[in-house]
């Protein structure tokens, strides 16, 4: 880390840091002085929120960050999922981003991958609403890559 990183949290807010969950009881500012893997509570997707293929991929990528003990399993699930999604989606923008997201995770940049996946939600919603991806395929993807349900 080239410089320090300062994050402000509100009372009751949680942050996931290197696999640990911290909750603050008052407004605080945290200053990270070295490299750290963290995820703010408002970016954490709960299992029940993983209702679309890309949200499922996000959930798996987030598990790489917040569950270090299960990182190998989560990474294997991510690989399986990304391969499946690359064969299912036809949208060129999504396909290009999925390849970039795969490279990010492969180089240990799961946090950046989460941001990129969130950026695809609107396109995915449009595809699903217009049924450009058949509902049967969406259901198959859900079954294949939803092991935490």
UniProtKB/Swiss-Prot annotation:
GO BP field: bacterial-type flagellum organization; mRNA catabolic process; negative regulation of bacterial-type flagellum assembly
Pfam annotation, one family: FlbT
Keyword presence, Repressor: yes
Record key words, sorted: Bacterial flagellum biogenesis, Repressor, RNA-binding
Cleavable signal peptide: none
Gene Ontology molecular function: mRNA 5'-UTR binding
Similarity field: Belongs to the FlbT family.
Function according to Swiss-Prot or TrEMBL: Has a post-transcriptional repressor function in flagellum biogenesis. Associates with the 5'-UTR of fljK mRNA and promotes its degradation.
Name by which UniProt lists this protein: Probable flagellum biosynthesis repressor protein FlbT
């Amino acid at each position: 880390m080239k410089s320090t990183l300062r994050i402000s949290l509100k009372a009751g807010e949680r942050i996931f840091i290197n696999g640990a969950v911290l909750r603050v009881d008052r407004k605080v500012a945290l200053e990270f002085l070295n490299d750290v893997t963290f995820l703010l509570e408002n970016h954490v997707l709960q299992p029940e929120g993983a209702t679309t293929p890309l949200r499922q991929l996000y959930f798996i990528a987030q598990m790489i960050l917040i569950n270090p003990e299960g990182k190998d399993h989560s990474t294997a699930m991510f690989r399986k999922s990304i391969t499946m999604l690359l064969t299912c989606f036809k949208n060129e923008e999504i396909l290009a981003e999925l390849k970039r997201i795969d490279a990010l995770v492969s180089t240990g940049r799961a946090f950046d991958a989460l941001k990129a996946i969130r950026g695809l939600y609107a396109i995915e919603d449009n595809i699903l609403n217009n049924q450009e991806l058949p509902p049967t395929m969406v259901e198959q993807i859900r079954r294949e890559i939803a092991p935490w349900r």
